[in-house]
Swiss-Prot record:
Matches recorded under Pfam families: FliMN_C
BP GO annotations: bacterial-type flagellum-dependent swarming motility; positive chemotaxis; protein secretion by the type III secretion system
Family (UniProt): Belongs to the FliN/MopA/SpaO family.
Residue ranges crossing the lipid bilayer per the database entry: none
NCBIfam families for this protein: PRK08158.1, SpaO_YscQ
Family matches, as InterPro entries: FliN-like_C (IPR001543), SpoA-like_sf (IPR036429), T3SS_OMP_SpaO (IPR003283), T3SS_SpaO/YscQ/SpaO (IPR013385)
Function: Involved in a secretory pathway responsible for the surface presentation of determinants needed for the entry of Salmonella species into mammalian cells.
Domain of life, per lineage: Bacteria
Species in which this protein is naturally found: Salmonella typhimurium (strain LT2 / SGSC1412 / ATCC 700720)
Signal peptide, first to last residue: none
Name of the protein in question: Surface presentation of antigens protein SpaO
Length: 303
């Protein structure tokens, strides 16, 4: 099945965005096809960030109707073009975010040389401008979206194993945490470290500016003996929390974050990013581990 995708011309889209912004401020701006009659002159700034067309005859009539009548035989462009080139600021740009410090004036061309497609027509203090190219509008900050939240997970360690072992794991088994760590993650990004204290946890380091990518790769031989030897990374998640940006910033100030009651009894067991079960955080001899209370085996019967 083929999808019907509406095509958007970026040039016209930028013109339309500016038209909407101008209209919002009470200025008339329309996207339309210009007439191809008469002579036209293209203007642009020195950096070529924008370009627009003018019809010299219309401009001369707007500035001086008497001169416009006299210029019918001589050609209005022969009067307007030298004036534009010689004047430092010949007109006020009707689009506030555009610059007109140095104006580039091209030679007059017939209307047949106008570009295909619509142009943005806006009146300046000297006459009509037909914009062909415009830059993006300046970004306007709309403030922080207060409802936006980020999912954090507080990881207490991980272990590397193989697929064949998963089939032998059941309720009551203890999965040892081979690599103990106390790290805060948002999706695959490591944000920092935390300490477990009485009554909750405290985020000790939180560097949002230099977020690290989580390394989920497991060192294996170049070739695997079989599918049962595929690597599996077990991750043990003590707690999950969705936070706002303000809450995330507060965590970086070593604010105490309360854990839910009996958080140690509900540690999530993730395998390659998939939730397979949960259990209780225990210590077997000198090694932390998780005793499985719930386990989703490949057969789906939890055994």
């Amino acid at each position: 099945m083929s999808l019907r995708v509406r095509q958007i011309d970026r040039r016209e889209w930028l013109l339309a965005q500016t038209a909407t912004e101008c209209q919002r401020h009470g200025r008339e701006a329309t996207l339309e096809y210009p007439t191809r009659q008469g002579m036209w002159v293209r203007l642009s700034d020195a950096e070529k960030r924008w370009s627009a067309w003018i019809k010299p005859g219309d401009w001369l009539e707007h500035v001086s109707p008497a001169l416009a009548g006299a210029a019918v035989s001589a050609g209005a462009e022969h009067l307007v073009v030298p004036w534009l080139a010689a004047t430092e600021r010949p007109f006020e740009l009707p689009v506030p975010h555009l610059s007109c410090r140095r104006l580039c004036v091209e030679n007059p061309v017939p209307g047949s040389a106008l570009p295909e497609g619509k142009l943005l027509h806006i009146m300046s203090d000297r006459g009509g401008l037909w914009f062909e190219h415009l830059p993006e509008l300046p970004a306007v900050g709309g403030g922080r979206p207060k409802m936006l939240r980020w999912p954090l997970r507080f990881v207490i360690g991980s272990s590397d194993t193989q697929r064949s072992l998963l089939g032998r794991i059941g309720i009551g088994d203890v999965l040892l945490i081979r690599t103990s760590r106390a790290e805060v993650y948002c999706y695959a990004k490591k944000l920092g470290h935390f300490n477990r204290v009485e009554g909750g946890i405290i985020v000790e380091t939180l560097d949002i500016q230099h977020i690290e990518e989580e390394n989920n790769t497991t060192e294996t031989a170049e070739t695997l003996p079989g599918l049962n030897q595929l690597p599996v990374k077990l991750e043990f998640v003590l707690y999950r929390k969705n936070v706002t940006l303000a809450e995330l910033e507060a965590m970086g100030q070593q604010q105490l974050l309360s854990l839910p009651t009996n958080a140690e009894l509900n540690v999530e067991i993730m395998a390659n990013g998939v939730l397979l079960g949960n259990g209780e955080l225990v210590q077997m001899n000198d090694t932390l581990g998780v005793e499985i209370h719930e386990w989703l085996s490949e057969s789906g019967n939890g055994e």
